[in-house]
Amino acid sequence: MKKLDVQIAIEADGWPDEAELEALSTRILDHAADFIAAEGQPFAPMPAEVSLVFTGDTEIQAINSEWRGQDKPTNVLSFPAYPIEPGDKPGPMLGDIVIARQTVEREAAELEKTITDHLTHLMVHGFLHLFGYDHMTEDEAEEMEGLETRILAGLGLSDPYAGQVPV
């Protein structure tokens, strides 16, 4: 059964075309959904809707300032439709993931990764936030980063946290 209905909106220049982003987003999020379902995450009986907004630094800075009180651009923001904890059954609307192109490009260059690989990581990261995963504490970060790493491995990508010193 299809678990997700992935909707995308492109709100800034410089992103790949809509068909390419939709295919990439669907492949990544379907894989992530299948992975967490195999780990025991329940899903609604109908496909759950998740929206991805591909924007730029100016737009995400305004959103980040309004919703998080941080007046600076960031790579990805997630807005769950309903607050849930990991393992809770979500409703038919998962929420929104907003990604900023310039920050993704800058970070990919700094990390010496392709833009697609870094974008894939950020999509998975944002998707897990919609299921209540977080990284505010060391234990939460360990759980979330472990899931991200295993999901990304299934997509053929290496551990994005390898070599980082824990905070």
Swiss-Prot record:
Annotated keywords: Cytoplasm, Endonuclease, Hydrolase, Metal-binding, Nuclease, Ribosome biogenesis, rRNA processing, Zinc
Binding, Zn(2+): H125, H129, H135
Superkingdom of origin organism: Bacteria
This protein's record includes keyword rRNA-binding: no
Principal subcellular localization: cytoplasm
Cofactor remark: Binds 1 zinc ion.
Cofactor section: Zn(2+)
GO cellular component term, pick one: cytoplasm
PANTHER family in UniProt: ENDORIBONUCLEASE YBEY, CHLOROPLASTIC
Protein name as annotated: Endoribonuclease YbeY
Native organism: Allorhizobium ampelinum (strain ATCC BAA-846 / DSM 112012 / S4) (Agrobacterium vitis (strain S4))
Lineage: Bacteria, Pseudomonadati, Pseudomonadota, Alphaproteobacteria, Hyphomicrobiales
